Amino acid sequence: MVARPVRSIEKDACMSFAEWLKSLVSTRGKTLSMYRSGMAKANRRDYQGAIADYSAAIESPEIPPDVKAMAIYNRALAYSAIHQDDKAADDLAMVLATPGLPENIRTAAQQRRERIRRRGE
């Protein structure tokens, strides 16, 4: 008799953990899907759509830090493509302020920021 309630509690705990894990993976999956959708839209030159998708991914609490930095960088490129240089520069500043940013991304962001600055002169 005692074993049945214990099994039931263990089963309930496992089910709760499984449901929590599934929701975590699902939220992360949705975030990465938004990021990829932004990339596809940018490739089709749908910059407004790309900006919306990148913004949705960036706002997600489940976005991995490296993907967030790339989403912000790519959003900056989309802003730059539609000549919203102030917003592009703000995004590039956010990218450059990201701790642990890989050097190649840092260099690309600095170069893009410099091009935007020169274009504004």
Describe each PLM feature range.
Residues R36, N74, Q111-R112:
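"A position-specific structural signal for the A-helix of alpha-solenoid helical repeats
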Residues P61, T98-G100:
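Alpha-helical junction/boundary sensor with strong preference for TPR arrays
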Residues S16-S33, E62:
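TPR-adjacent "capping" and linker segments in tetratricopeptide-repeat scaffold/adaptor proteins
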Residues G29, V67, N104-T107:
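Structural signature of alpha-solenoid helical repeat junctions
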